[in-house]
Amino acid sequence: MSISARNQLKGKVVGLKKGVVTAEVVLEIAGGNKITSIISLDSVEELGVKEGAELTAVVKSTDVMILA
């Protein structure tokens, strides 16, 4: 599949917390850094997200939030 987003981060799922409607996915990327995303449970099932899976996060620069 080809996409236009330039911010693609490959990593491994190191955390997965399922809620009622959404799930929190923690991806460990290069350098041991971690990024967290909230996605729907439907997406978790459709994408086959599970701990240890190798995934690519696609990040739109306009959708980044920084927490301090």
UniProtKB/Swiss-Prot annotation:
Source domain of life: Bacteria
Gene3D superfamilies documented for this protein: 2.40.50.100
SUPFAM superfamilies: MOP-like (SSF50331)
A biological process from GO: molybdate ion transport
Keyword Lipid biosynthesis: no
Coiled-coil segments on the chain, per record: none
Keywords per UniProt: Molybdenum
Domain Mop: from-to ranges: 2-68
Pfam families: TOBE
Keyword flag Cell inner membrane: no
Biological function: Binds one mole of molybdenum per mole of protein and contains a pterin.
Protein name: Molybdenum-pterin-binding protein 2
Organism: Clostridium pasteurianum
